[in-house]
Amino acid sequence: MCIRDSDRVKAVADACRQRGIPIRIGVNSGSLEKEILAKYGHPTPEALCDSALYHASLLEKFDFNDIVLSMKSSTVSTMIKAYELAAERCDYPLHLGVTEAGTERMGIIKSSAGIGALLLHGIGDTIRVSLTADPVKEVYAAHDILKALDIEKDGVQFVSCPTCGRTRIDLVKIANEVEDKLRNCKKNIKVAVMGCVVNGPGEAREADIGIAGGDGCGLVFKKGEILRKVPEDKLVDALLEEVEKL
């Protein structure tokens, strides 16, 4: 909702101040003012940043500074640059996100690229992953981005290798099953699912616990040290048992 009338802006600012509620100013390519569009020609990063700071100035006139800025674009490079400009020009908290990112597959890729690039440079305070998918998957994706960047410590860091000629187990099925069953595990651990015993324990020696496939069987290892050998159909259960012990 866009409120520009001075009296209405003051009323909103006063009400939020009395209740200790921050105001998030959300800008996207479809919300830009005609004057700003005329100046830049199209929704550039500069246009998004100018619009957000303009709306912030409307609140600042009434001494309201409990503000969060959001400048979302469906183009990752535009979104990144807009937030970089805002970080240079103000000290307000920034809410990161790629708007209209798309379906689960492409949306996660675009959100990870945009949000991740900014967080790696210390830009951003809150995030939102927008997907044309089950909203629960948006939450999972957001947590996964934070875990991948070592910002969030709660939950499993899951690693698995691509299949190769040495793989003799159904690695894809096993990896998906393990990831799904550990999705809500809150332990700060790294779990590995590797395709072969030749490289598995060595490549994933930093994992707290892991499995490596053989021919109809596999090894369970901990910090690169082999614990035991189990049949392929028992690999997942054996791994989960070891996770419970950690």
Q: Which residue stretches match the model-derived regions?
A:
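Conserved small/polar residues in nucleotide/adenosyl-binding loops
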Residues: 1-5
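Short amphipathic alpha-helices and their capping/turn segments at secondary-structure boundaries
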Residues: 6-23
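Conserved, mostly hydrophobic/aromatic
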Residues: 25, 69, 118, 161, ...
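Catalytic alpha/beta core domains of metabolic enzymes, predominantly
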Residues: 28, 36-183
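Hydrophobic alpha-helical bundle architecture
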Residues: 174-201, 205
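Nucleotide-binding motor/catalytic cores of P-loop/tubulin-like NTPases across gene-expression machines
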Residues: 197-226
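Beta-strand/loop-dominated core regions that host nucleotide or nucleotide-derived cofactor-binding catalytic loops
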Residues: 215-221, 225-246
